[in-house]
């Protein structure tokens, strides 16, 4: 059965989650032998030629709307070689390119492989306190902030648009202290425009799909959309410093 087929012993049918995600290497041997078809691959392997061909099927829509291609994640820049090749081929057809990143990457490699073919960068900033960033995101934020400074400096000497974004999470990223620190950091680096991403509780229902039976709760408001008054408070922290805020409500 699937448990016996797994070379990493990542399937434990007696556990609530069934699949131990930390052990799974996505070899898909369990999928190949699953007798009921309950396990299946999500996504497909695709080569660059096929990917570019699929993307360019919408080229007429890009031209008519002024749109283009956004690469997101996860962290898309964990695959910098592929992103760079994709963007370079799209720019040969004058397709607008945008990348969304949390900026945990080697900036010199990014500057050589991806930046020359990028029109717009969405840069997510979550927490200014490094200890809190490590607690909630798994890593400190020193290199992220340094990358932000470098990319901002590069963008000032080019036509690249950089739009910093702050995802709002109740009692974690949306505190006055954290948002004020982010706003001051943006000012130091010449930011004039940014975007706040209102909290969306729909993610809670996605947990079981990722094999988690634990329902996270970080206080009142976890299961609710953020009220307009709270969005106004967050917006004012940036606009009081002269930073224009984009917010889709």
Listing of model-derived features with the role each one plays in the protein:
Residues 37, 92-93, 241:
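Conserved dinucleotide-binding and phosphotransfer motif residues
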Residues 1-22, 29-45:
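Iron-sulfur cluster-binding cysteine motifs and their immediate structural context
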Residues 240-249:
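Radical SAM enzyme core and accessory elements
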Residues 42, 197-199, 248:
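Conserved beta-strand termini and adjacent loop/short-helix elements that scaffold enzyme active sites
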Residues 49-209:
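Conserved AdoMet/S-adenosylmethionine-binding subsite of the radical SAM
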Residues 184, 192, 207-237:
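A structural motif corresponding to the C-terminal lobe/cap of the Radical SAM core domain
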